[in-house]
């Protein structure tokens, strides 16, 4: 990442950069920080920050990937409302929150809810969507989209039904309604996490959201349902209510895993789910006991 220019309250400043850390003198009062940087997503092979996957731009910012996009105090306790403008010739341009304005070759997204930088997301590419709509208990209509590469549209139906079931279950069991006008899922082949709960724009490894009866097993379907539920449940346990620091990671993840386990138990067999959870704990959490 290369710093092109920096300003504080509109005045050019000269920060020092050492070992990737930027230091600059700041006023003793609130101020506006502006930075213009240059990055190279095409050569970003770490798959962290903003990178390119098969002609599509996408992001992965948990835990500290946002600092590879721009200079920012990307700690989970630093929360802000984001407005993002994307300019590109690519047909689909997505980010967090709700679309607020658009024109030829550009779109703006605004997320009204303060969030830490690890939940920032951006996707740009040649994608097609499987669309649906969900009506919350209070009567708000939410547009739902699963974005995929052309040719994968026929593998989205199960994932969409799992998403709607997760939204309804969270309303009925925890009284938590979705809080934006749109919810997007993007399937990415080269994604180094199973899935990521970015606010309003979940990014999934394709294997965790796409399925068809011809090529997927029963366990594939159950896994996809559980992962979609887990990432959606993070909207409240992790996104709106986040952790103070990364030593508290177990709080947001532990609570959300508990919630997705409850969801699977309600949707399928509670006894079988409990047995599988114990097998998983013994095999992964307590390997020394095997």
Regions found by a protein language model. Give the residues of each.
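Acidic/His-enriched low-complexity segments
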Residues: 1-182, 207
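Hydrophobic alpha-helical and helix-loop surface patches within well-folded domains
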Residues: 3, 9-11, 18-20, 109, ...
């Amino acid at each position: 990442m290369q710093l092109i220019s920096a300003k504080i309250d509109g005045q050019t400043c000269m920060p020092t950069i050492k070992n990737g850390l930027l230091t600059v003198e700041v006023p003793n009062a609130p101020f506006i920080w502006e930075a213009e940087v240059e990055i190279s997503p095409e050569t970003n092979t770490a798959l962290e920050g903003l990178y390119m996957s098969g002609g599509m731009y996408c992001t992965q910012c948990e835990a500290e990937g946002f600092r590879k996009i721009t200079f920012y105090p990307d700690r989970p306790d630093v929360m802000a409302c984001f407005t993002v403008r994307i300019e590109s010739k690519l047909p689909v341009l997505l980010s967090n929150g709700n679309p607020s304005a658009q024109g030829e070759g550009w779109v703006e997204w605004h997320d009204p809810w303060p969030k830490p930088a690890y939940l920032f997301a951006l996707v740009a590419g040649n994608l097609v969507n499987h669309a649906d709509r969900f009506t919350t208990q209070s009567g708000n209509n939410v547009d739902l989209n699963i974005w995929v590469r052309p040719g994968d549209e026929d593998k989205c139906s199960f994932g969409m039904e799992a998403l709607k079931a997760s939204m309804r279950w969270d309303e009925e069991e925890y009284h938590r309604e979705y809080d934006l006008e749109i919810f997007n899922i993007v399937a990415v082949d080269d994604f180094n996490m199973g899935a990521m709960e970015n606010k309003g724009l979940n990014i999934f490894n394709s294997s965790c959201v796409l399925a068809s009866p011809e090529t997927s097993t029963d366990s594939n379907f159950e896994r996809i349902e559980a992962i979609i539920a887990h990432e959606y449940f993070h909207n409240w346990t992790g996104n709106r209510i986040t952790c103070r620091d990364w030593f508290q990671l177990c709080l947001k993840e532990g609570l959300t895993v508990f919630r997705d386990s409850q969801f699977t138990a309600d949707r399928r067999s509670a006894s079988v789910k409990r047995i599988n959870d114990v097998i998983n704990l013994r095999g992964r959490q307590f390997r020394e006991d095997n």
